């Protein structure tokens, strides 16, 4: 197996650390029989596409949204990954960092979507409580019907006091929170943890979403969207494509002439089911996709960059949801390499050990010895961290381009 060159942004001081790891042993990527039984089968069409590199790709009329530039020297960056890995959040961060950001009109539109995220999560939790024969606290039962009722919201209209009262009460309900903390088989939106802590502010009649509110907002990506940014006198064209299985047939229309591929993985997905398939595991799906993509000839000249994302959520859940329950070959190590410790200087060994374990899982899948893949631990909602990481990503892309010209 080929080695994987990893580049990390130090979250404490911004220093970039580069480390070259030797070939990993086969045991790093092995799984038990019971674990393999849960691995989803990659769609045949995607396997065929990734194994070959046809001369002509037939167009299916996929519409690319955004401001496209036609310059031959543009840097094309493709964001790939399974659903709910954080690709669209990266795009929103790029808008905040390298463009004017979000207008008041757009912020008011996000207000409606944030409301829908909260209500959808509560409906899912109420359904899970019913399936588990768990009741709300007696004083909160009256709010069940309020949440399950069909709701509509407009960008300029305040939320009703009735809905606020119900949401406020249920987000504090201890029995609902217990189901929430144990609901690894739920396709619960990660952002619900964040919005729970801001209910009073969100339901204020004058509420306008903040940058963080927008970054946490979950919107399913359908089709292909494009944003162009001017960075250091270079035009970067970022393509975000839907990660759920139903969207992957559209990926091929972005595969040609890719300068850099950013593959996103939700670290917090090690114990979560897929949004589109309750029997599938998010991390297993990501490993399967990465295996096919990083070894594909489509990207033989592209910089390969891996974002192990949602580190903040991973740190929160690793103590309440054991990794070994979902990945039986996992063993906590006594110490981790310096580059892992640098990423999480305040984290305990359980968190660092988990980070290193999943890093090695992805590292071991790169079977092309000549290909360097660069890895970053990220929290896509952390703007300052993403800014440092993106500086490193730009360096990686430019270095890869220079090597291509030389060889």
UniProtKB/Swiss-Prot annotation:
Which parts of the sequence belong to the G-alpha domain?
73-407
Q: Where is this region: G5 motif?
A: 378-383
Q: Which residues bind GTP?
A: 84-89, 190, 215, 221, 243, 309-310, 312, 380
Protein origin, superkingdom: Eukaryota
Instruction: Report residue spans for region: G2 motif.
Output: 213-221
- Record GO terms (molecular function): G protein-coupled receptor binding; G-protein beta/gamma-subunit complex binding; GTP binding; GTPase activity; metal ion binding
Q: Which UniProt keywords apply?
A: GTP-binding, Hydrolase, Lipoprotein, Magnesium, Metal-binding, Myristate, Nucleotide-binding, Palmitate, Pheromone response, Sporulation, Transducer
Q: Which SMART domains match?
A: G_alpha (SM00275)
Region G3 motif: list its residue ranges: 236-245
Q: Which InterPro entries match?
A: Fungi_Gprotein_alpha, Gprotein_alpha_su, GproteinA_insert, P-loop_NTPase
Where is lipid attached as N-myristoyl glycine? 2
Signal peptide (from-to) = none
Give yes or no: UniProt keyword Magnesium: yes
The segments labelled G4 motif in the record are 305-312
Instruction: Indicate the quaternary assembly.
Output: G proteins are composed of 3 units; alpha, beta and gamma. The alpha chain contains the guanine nucleotide binding site.
Query: Tell me, what does this protein do in biology?
Result: Implicated in the mating and sporulation pathway. Probably coupled to mating-factor receptors. May act in concert with Ras1.
* UniProt record similarity statement: Belongs to the G-alpha family. G(q) subfamily.
Protein name listed in UniProt? Guanine nucleotide-binding protein alpha-1 subunit
What is the name of the gene encoding this protein? gpa1
């Amino acid at each position: 197996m080929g080695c994987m060159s990893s580049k990390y942004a130090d979250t404490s001081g911004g220093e970039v650390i580069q480390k070259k790891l030797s070939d990993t042993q086969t045991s790093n990527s092995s799984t038990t029989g019971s674990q393999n039984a849960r691995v989803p089968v990659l769609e045949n069409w995607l396997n065929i596409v990734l194994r070959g590199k046809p001369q002509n790709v037939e167009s299916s009329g996929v519409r690319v949204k955004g401001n496209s530039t036609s310059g031959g020297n543009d840097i094309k960056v493709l964001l790939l990954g399974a659903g709910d890995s954080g690709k669209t959040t990266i795009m929103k961060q790029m808008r905040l960092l390298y463009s004017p950001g979000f207008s008041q009109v757009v912020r008011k539109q996000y207000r409606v979507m944030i409301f829908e995220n909260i209500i959808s999560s509560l409906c899912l939790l109420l359904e899970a409580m019913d399936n588990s024969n768990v009741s709300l606290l007696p004083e909160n039962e009256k709010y069940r019907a309020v949440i399950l009722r069909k709701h509509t919201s407009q960008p300029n209209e305040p939320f009703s006091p009735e809905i606020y009262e119900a949401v406020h009460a249920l987000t504090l309900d201890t029995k609902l929170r217990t189901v929430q903390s144990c609901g690894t088989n739920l396709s619960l939106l990660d952002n619900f943890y964040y919005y729970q802590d801001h209910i009073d502010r969100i339901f204020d009649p004058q509420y306008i979403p903040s940058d963080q509110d927008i970054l946490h907002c979950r919107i399913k990506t359908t089709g292909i969207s494009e944003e162009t940014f001017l960075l250091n006198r270079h035009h970067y064209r970022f393509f975000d494509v839907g990660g759920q299985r139903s969207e992957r047939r559209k990926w091929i229309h972005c595969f040609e002439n890719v300068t850099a591929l950013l593959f996103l993985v939700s670290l917090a997905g090690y114990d979560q089911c897929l949004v589109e398939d309750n029997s599938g595991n998010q991390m297993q799906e990501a490993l399967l996709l990465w295996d096919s993509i990083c070894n594909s000839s489509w990207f033989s000249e592209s910089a390969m960059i891996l974002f192990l994302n949602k580190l903040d959520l991973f740190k929160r859940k690793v103590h309440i949801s054991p990794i070994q329950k979902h990945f039986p070959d996992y063993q906590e190590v006594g110490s981790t390499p310096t580059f892992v410790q640098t990423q999480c200087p305040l984290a305990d060994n359980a968190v660092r050990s988990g980070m290193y374990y999943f890093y090695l899982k992805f590292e071991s899948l790169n079977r092309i010895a000549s290909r360097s893949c660069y890895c970053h631990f990220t929290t896509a909602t952390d703007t300052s961290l993403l800014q440092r990481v993106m500086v490193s990503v730009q360096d990686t892309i430019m270095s890869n381009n220079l090597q291509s010209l030389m060889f």
